[in-house]
Amino acid sequence: RNVKRNESRTILVIVPDICDPFFSEIIRGIEVTAANHGYLVLIGDCAHQNQQEKTFIDLIITKQIDGMLLLGSRLPFDASIEEQRNLPPMVMANEFAPELELPTVHIDNLTAAFDAVNYLYEQGHKRIGCIAGPEEMPLCHYRLQGYVQALRRCGIMVDPQYIARGDFTFEAGSRAMQQLLDLPQPPTAVFCHSDVMALGALSQAKR
């Protein structure tokens, strides 16, 4: 009973960038499920991590949250594996970071990328570019692997020139698309690792 009285019935959801529309549907689903179980949801934006770090730590120390849900691949503050054991329960969703040793809910990024690239091939495209995310992120590694495997399955040689990288921002997508368009034989279709980069790529392609 004492434990029940000390519960805040509040979950902190850490979002890499609250401005990314990709997360809106995910957050809505989290809030609906949390409400059904009598929990409130706090949203923490990691886009300005240095400013927010103290706030997140204060919430934990003062026991104002019962759990954390990470939608990115990083903790919003430094904590060793040993220190993580003293934190509220944490689950990672959408991303995959083996080094954090957290329970994880995520999609099969390799298969999803393979299917997307294979679809482009079935539409008649042979020169398929890729705007990949940061190299250090596991999900980007798997998505790039899916891209490469799909091309090989379709009998298309992988051309490193057709792979550009960005940091999941609109501007990065735009720059990466321009890089691909500047090639002597630009791709006729492009597979993007994120919706926001895809929007930037589309904007650049229409200029």
Q: Which sequence ranges carry the predicted segments?
A:
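Amphipathic helical "hinge" segments at domain boundaries
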Residues: 1-67, 145, 152
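Short beta-strand segments enriched in small/hydrophobic residues
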Residues: 3-19, 73, 119, 127-134
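Redox-cofactor binding/interface segments in oxidoreductases and associated redox assembly factors
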Residues: 13, 70, 192
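Bacterial carbohydrate/catabolite-sensing allosteric modules
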Residues: 29-40, 58-62, 85-92, 96-207
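Short, ordered loop/turn segments at secondary-structure junctions
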Residues: 46-48, 73, 95-96, 133
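Short beta->alpha connector loops
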Residues: 47-50, 71-76, 196
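Short acidic active-site motifs
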Residues: 52-56, 77-80, 172, 176
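Acidic, Gly/Pro-rich loop/turn segments at junctions of secondary structure
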Residues: 67-80, 92-102
